[in-house]
Regions:
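Beta-strand/loop-rich accessory regions of lumenal/periplasmic or secreted enzymes
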Residues: 47-49, 78-362
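Carbohydrate-binding surfaces of carbohydrate-active enzymes
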Residues: 1-105, 111, 360-361
Length: 362
């Protein structure tokens, strides 16, 4: 048996090129008997940190690959910073405008309009074309109550900051000069000391994060960097690998004998999002995550209709169509892996952030 390693460089979302192998070689395996453990070794190549993914492949005595594993070389923030460095610069400046009911951030032909009464995104346009991301961010698995909001310019970037009471402290929206819209959400910040009457979280916590509305009728597929190509559950993540994946839209319901079954299933939770492009001839959209370990929920799969009545096999999905989640539920099973999470805020906690960027440009 033998193993080999590869350092892979992945293309950015706007390029459909295949991944590039920057370096590869053999892994030095220890001489061990079945059931024993040992340490494998290989030397890092000079170009190691120029890559995005480390891939390990195992081969049997016949030379057939029997298993492979992938590991990210860069965390989400470093990957996104490098992506931004590759983008063309602009001398333009973002701006904002307001009326009695709304706030609008504007840059490079992209406009994002928010409701003054609750801080929610209500409409996005690229030129005259409406991108149907709206009605969010709605809280998932937690409570948050709109408190206040303010607008400002920071250099060439327009910033809309929304303050909340409850489990969420604030969401900062940034319109960059090139038209990218950033969302920086701070949650579980005990230091904020916002007074909120009631329970901060759902009990139990099955999903935890934020949701938006986005109709699926015009979506033709999805291309993404993260774990794939399959959807996941909290206790069904093993077996997925880091990489750039592509799948066409389908409504496969496993167990429905009268449907054409197309795999991988399109709808569901996707692990460790770096970026994802929802493909559409009319309203494409790409989202990037600067935060490690975010689950991307894409629409809501149907339950089997003709199964025996033995209870629902999966937990209820969040409201909305697209969700960005710190936590997802497990598929029903025995053992601790199927248990819901428990969240506790301790005195002095600074909270943690979810940082996303939305690209509505063609």
């Amino acid at each position: 048996c033998r193993m080999k390693w590869k350092v892979m460089r992945l293309p950015i979302p706007q390029v459909s090129d295949s991944p590039i192998c920057l370096a590869e070689g053999g892994v030095l395996l220890p001489a061990i008997q079945p059931g024993e453990k040992g340490i494998a070794h290989f030397d890092l190549p000079e170009k190691f940190f120029n890559g995005d993914i480390l891939e390990l492949e195992a081969y049997n005595v016949a030379g057939d690959m029997i298993c492979n594993w992938t590991f990210p070389i860069k965390n989400n923030r470093k990957y996104f910073i490098e992506y931004r460095y590759l983008q063309p610069t602009t001398t333009a400046t973002a701006r904002y405008q307001t009326d009695d009911n709304s706030v609008t951030l504007i840059a490079n032909g992209v406009t994002a309009t928010f409701n003054k009464a609750n801080g929610n995104l209500v409409e996005v346009k690229n030129g005259s074309k409406i991108i149907p991301l709206s009605d969010g961010p709605l809280p998932v698995g937690m409570k948050m109550l709109f408190c206040s909001a303010n607008l400002k310019m920071q250099g060439d970037t327009a910033i809309y900051t929304v303050k909340y009471k409850g489990a969420a402290d604030s969401i900062v929206w940034r319109m960059a000069p090139d038209g990218l819209l950033g969302m920086d959400a701070l949650v579980l910040n005990y230091r904020a000391k916002n007074k909120f009457d009631g329970v901060y979280f759902d009990r139990p916590v099955l999903n935890f994060g934020f949701s938006f509305s986005f109709p699926e009728k015009n979506i033709s597929g999805m291309r993404w960097l993260g774990k794939g190509p399959y959807r996941v559950w909290k206790n069904r993540i093993e077996g997925t690998n880091y990489g750039i994946w592509q799948k066409d839209y389908n409504n496969t319901v496993t167990g429905e004998y009268y449907h054409q079954l197309i795999y991988p299933e399109f709808k569901g939770y996707h692990a460790d999002l770096y970026w994802a492009t929802l493909q559409s001839k009319t309203t494409p959209m790409t989202v990037y995550s600067e935060t490690d370990g975010i689950f991307f929920r894409v629409f809501t799969p149907e339950e089997q209709r003709d199964r025996e009545s033995r209870g629902i096999s999966v937990k209820e999905y969040p409201a909305g169509d697209l969700s960005f989640l710190f936590e997802i539920p497990a598929v029903n099973s025995q053992g601790t892996g199927g248990e819901a999470s428990y969240i506790k805020i301790n005195k002095g906690d600074d909270g943690f952030r979810m940082k996303l960027w939305f690209d509505f440009r063609n």
